[in-house]
Amino acid sequence: MPTTFHEIPRKRPTTPLLDRANTPDGLRRLGEAELETLADELRLELLYTVGQTGGHFGAGLGVIELTIALHYVFDTPDDRLVWDVGHQAYPHKILTGRRERMETLRQKDGIAAFPRRSESEYDTFGVGHSSTSISAALGMAIAARLQNSDRKAIAVIGDGALTAGMAFEALNHAPEVDANMLVILNDNDMSISRNVGGLSNYLAKILSSRTYASMREGSKKVLSRLPGAWEIARRTEEYAKGMLVPGTLFEELGWNYIGPIDGHDLPTLIATLRNMRDLKGPQFLHIVTKKGKGFAPAEVDPIGYHAITKLEPLDAPAAAPKKAGGPKYSGVFGEWLCDMAAADPRLVGITPAMKEGSDLVAFSERFPLRYFDVAIAEQHAVTLAAGMACEGAKPVVAIYSTFLQRGYDQLVHDVAVQNLDVLFAIDRAGLVGEDGPTHAGSFDLSFLRCIPGMVIMTPSDENELRKMLTTGHLYNGPAAVRYPRGTGPNATIEKDLEPIEIGKGVVRRQGSKVALLVFGVQMAEALKVAETLDATVVDMRFVKPMDEALVREIANSHDLLVTIEENAIMGGAGGAVSEFLARENILKSVLHLGLPDVYVEHAKPAQMLAECGLDEVGIEAAVRERLELLNR
């Protein structure tokens, strides 16, 4: 069984077996008796690597044995291995030729936090969002059949990801086309897994064997000729298996269910996977693992060790006092939610599995009957809110920008068309740093702005966020407040619950010739640039309805308008300004600054903003360049 480690090594560990198994070909040259030692070395290497870079932690520790078994049994990359979400894929990266590059994990120009097709042939499908693996692997299995190939398709999905409807859509479809594929349920929640042990492991070996499969198919042919006999036999088999395994649901959908088995028992994993590799049709293997396995602190606190920051060197010089910063925007939201809930009993809070990330912990404890975590089910979260709003509740949907994309139809069809009172608190808007393009909130202004009746707000600091949340809550109709990851500029927060006037911007600095129209948190950078250029700075506040009277006034008194937003330029807030000017036949030079028409790769947030020209240096340079053109 796995060795348990108690601290993260600060020096690279000695790993003689892992040194020979940097690729799956090297791994397959090892003897089975060596694999458990390899698992200890790989776990130690993962502890060291993530300690150096920071990153997702607990999930990878929990699939060390599974990763080894999959690459040992299957002919990757010819056999297609698809990881769901990708939090658990660091051991996979180490074993597929990227060990020496793990020092660059999640850094600019380094390897990504998630599997990427452009990074390795072993990364067969790019992931980041949850619950896509079964659909992708099914598509690969169907393509293999059309190409007369016998390559395998394997999806590894966690029990949390199975809460999403998309996963069940794929589970329902695969038996309809009799796909030759394997789904592995990595169950690390322990909620449906009490039957793990020697008997269950033994049963899994029997049920996954060729002998059992042949006997089952032969019996089916014979008994199918006898009226009622096959149905009796099928029910008897289900009853016998059901006493030991929780797989009836998957069997009813048409999958050959095996398990649950201990996901840290390498010999059993390898034997079971070898048996299942040769079976035809849709196969489902249920394994039970422990998130953070092999690192004692993570086993005790798997949520706290979901991801970690990098270790500071032991000999690091004393750090300078940190510059005072404001609270996290998510923290401001969480405090407001509790305050408003105390003032308004109609308020309910909804989140799709982001209680900690969106800062709903305090709300869930103070108002447990008004708190709803719907798990990874964004579509359901939005329509649930719509149903509540129909009955007089005031739902607040706390959701990351990137995940709101999954509930877009529900936002339009179920909320906006009916003009329901639902407030969307959109966290992680804009660039998010090391998690890269799959998690960036680059598009919400673009896809929200076109929805009739939607009020869209972009706070420039913590106090503005609190006021806008109140404004959205009191508005009779759908509203959205989008705010970034990280901390604010430490603005003074007014504790009252007073709204601001909808559709009204504010001039923060009066200048001449150049006007910077800011939608969001680039206000601090804009004010610094304005001091150098003597520019006017406008806090636009509202993307929709936009303060058209203020835009007209500014356009008539300045030579150049510069819109600034941390959203895609295409379809974004700046576009609303240009559309208004064109509609009013106001001819004015407008410069749009925002996210370019590319996926911005992972890096530190400051590096990403600089790359996009949204830091102080980039904004000033772009404005000066445009002024030079105007002055020619």
From Swiss-Prot:
It comes from Pseudomonas fluorescens (strain Pf0-1). This is 1-deoxy-D-xylulose-5-phosphate synthase. GO terms for molecular function: 1-deoxy-D-xylulose-5-phosphate synthase activity; magnesium ion binding; thiamine pyrophosphate binding. Residues 1-25 are annotated as: Disordered. Its EC number is 2.2.1.7. GO terms for biological process: 1-deoxy-D-xylulose 5-phosphate biosynthetic process; isopentenyl diphosphate biosynthetic process, methylerythritol 4-phosphate pathway; terpenoid biosynthetic process; thiamine biosynthetic process. Pathway: Metabolic intermediate biosynthesis; 1-deoxy-D-xylulose 5-phosphate biosynthesis; 1-deoxy-D-xylulose 5-phosphate from D-glyceraldehyde 3-phosphate and pyruvate: step 1/1. Homodimer. Keywords: Isoprene biosynthesis, Magnesium, Metal-binding, Thiamine biosynthesis, Thiamine pyrophosphate, Transferase. It catalyses: D-glyceraldehyde 3-phosphate + pyruvate + H(+) = 1-deoxy-D-xylulose 5-phosphate + CO2. Mg(2+) binds at residues 159, 188. It comes from the Bacteria. Thiamine diphosphate binds at residues 87, 128-130, 160-161, 188, 295, 378. Binds 1 Mg(2+) ion per subunit. Binds 1 thiamine pyrophosphate per subunit. HAMAP family: DXP_synth (MF_00315). Transmembrane segments: none annotated. Belongs to the transketolase family. DXPS subfamily. Catalyzes the acyloin condensation reaction between C atoms 2 and 3 of pyruvate and glyceraldehyde 3-phosphate to yield 1-deoxy-D-xylulose-5-phosphate (DXP).
